[in-house]
């Protein structure tokens, strides 16, 4: 009798794989607030960090590297101490990529991808446009340039987990003050249309011709959830839970049925963002 082993895209043995996404708003600052002590207790397989706000040599040493992990960085080369992304992993990737081909975007340290067999885990940091028209214009340029890349990945045959701070909410469920933010970056109709035009939270919403198909892990698991991942440092936004959900894990449709559960950790404040964890069946 021939026995077959069910296919699993995940590069580990065991019943599940845990991936955490976290915008640190400065990894050195987050470390002083206990982030790595918390992370060491989470049994995560992969951690995707955004806004490291440091150069790799400034993040060397045991204070920034929990036992059992390796780390890969993509620093901003045009402006030191700005942006920056990283991936921590228990397993050595087969390949790490740090550029998508547009120098202005790549040199700001906004993308890193770790490849494990047929699985790609990406840490993305999409620009914010909140500082003014110039950066909002750049954000729209990034969105236009990135869309065909995301559509290509969707149909590439690879399994993808896209972690990161996308600086865009998807709907009124994702922001406390929906009406008053309609003209603010991150909640602009054009931004929401772009992001929602890539997503298919239910299988029947997928449309290969238009490029819709990415699954928002949180929304797939919590269709009516109203949890947030970012709060302004102004006033008492965090205390009053006046937040935005702008940190995501988007996955290819092949991983929809692998979604096991997710959580947003708010008991401690390591940053103006909260760590977002997703568990996947392997």
Language-model regions, residue ranges each:
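N-terminal, active-site-proximal structural segment of metallo-dependent hydrolase catalytic domains
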Residues: 2-3, 7-65, 73, 77-85, ...
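Structured beta-strand-rich core segments of catalytic domains in phosphoester-bond hydrolases
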Residues: 52-55, 60-129
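Active-site beta-strand/loop signature of hydrolases that rely on acidic residues for catalysis
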Residues: 22-23, 39-57, 121, 149-172, ...
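Active-site-proximal beta-strand elements of phosphoester/diester hydrolases
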Residues: 17-25, 118-130, 163
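Conserved beta strand-loop-helix elements of the APE1-like EEP
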Residues: 80-96, 225, 237-257
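Surface-exposed cleft-lining segments at the edges of enzyme active sites
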Residues: 101-102, 126-143, 179-184
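Metal-dependent phosphoesterases centered on the DNase I-like endonuclease/exonuclease/phosphatase
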Residues: 67-70, 142-242, 246
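Active-site beta-strand termini and strand-to-loop segments that position acidic
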Residues: 90, 114-117, 241, 252-253, ...
């Amino acid at each position: 009798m021939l026995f077959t082993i069910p296919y699993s895209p995940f590069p580990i043995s065991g019943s599940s794989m845990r991936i955490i996404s976290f915008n640190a708003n400065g990894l050195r600052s987050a470390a002083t607030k206990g982030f790595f002590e918390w992370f060491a207790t989470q049994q995560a397989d992969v951690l995707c960090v955004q806004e490291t706000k440091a150069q790799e040599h400034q993040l060397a040493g045991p204070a920034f590297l929990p036992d059992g992990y390796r780390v890969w960085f993509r620093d901003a080369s045009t402006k030191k101490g700005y942006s920056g992304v990283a991936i921590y992993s228990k397993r050595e990737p087969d390949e790490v990529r740090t550029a998508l081909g547009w120098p202005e975007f790549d040199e700001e340290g906004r993308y890193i991808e770790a490849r494990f067999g047929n699985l790609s885990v990406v840490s993305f940091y999409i620009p914010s446009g909140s500082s003014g028209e110039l950066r909002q214009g750049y954000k729209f340029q990034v969105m236009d340039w990135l869309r065909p890349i995301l559509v290509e990945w969707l149909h590439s045959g690879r399994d993808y987990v896209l972690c990161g701070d996308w600086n865009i909410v998807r709907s009124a469920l994702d922001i406390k003050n929906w009406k008053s933010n309609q003209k603010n970056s991150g909640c602009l109709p054009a931004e929401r249309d772009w992001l929602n035009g890539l997503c298919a939270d239910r299988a029947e919403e997928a449309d290969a011709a238009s490029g819709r198909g990415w699954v928002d892990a949180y929304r797939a698991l919590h269709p009516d959830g109203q949890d947030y991942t970012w709060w302004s440092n102004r006033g008492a936004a965090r205390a009053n839970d006046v937040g935005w959900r702008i940190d995501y894990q988007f996955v290819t449709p092949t991983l929809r049925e692998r979604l096991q559960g997710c959580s947003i950790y708010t008991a401690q404040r390591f940053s103006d963002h909260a760590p977002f964890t997703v568990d996947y069946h392997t």
